[in-house]
Amino acid sequence: TDGNKEPTDFSVTLENGFKNFTDLQLKVFFRSSGRDNLITRKYEASPYINMPKGYGYEIQYMNMSGKKYKFMMNLMRRKGEEYASALGWNKAYDFMVEYTPTDSISYSIFYQDLKEKDWLNWLENNLLGTYEKRQRLTVGGINWFKGDKHELRLKAQMVAFTARSPQAYLANNIGDLIQADIALPPITLSDLAFQIRYRYEIKPLSYFYLVYTKGGRVVQYDEEDNLGEIYQRPWDDPETDT
């Protein structure tokens, strides 16, 4: 049996620029059915999983040339990706806004919300699970400069990942998934990375740095879906997994 049957993929990108410096891009792709020979970590009894064909589109609209405002918006609906297979459909949107009122300060915010049906997750050996997956990501930042001497940067990244409605499967030796009567818990993951960094130039190529960082990851097996609560968990107790 050939466990290295690679799918073929094809994509087309159309792009149009406007006089107001905005840019519109449409991308479509197709990926043939094939085998994922990585997901089971080379487990001998089930070395690969058969994956269906994939296809979808992505629309992007942006203006990254504005003097005070820059923005980007994306909308996606796809089954898998151009270079990665998936069992179910996913849809996502994201946006980014950057505001620079003066040359000395800028603010930015990025947000993404992704939902995927039948997200396939390897658990151990030939045991896998499918879930209703949702991932929300927020990234914010502030950059401030005063002349060539002072620089202050603040950045925060927060991830809220949930996997609901779990269903267990056992993979056989020809890549098929057989539904199994095994109880799997839901998953709620919170991830935080936060940093404030101040830099002072003592003299050319000689700097003083003052840095504060906070981060952590919390995994719990519950069904909390409130975004604020999930984001708050690693702030309160960044090393707690249950």
Which ranges hold each PLM region?
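Exposed, low-structure sequence patches enriched in small/polar residues
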Residues: 1-242
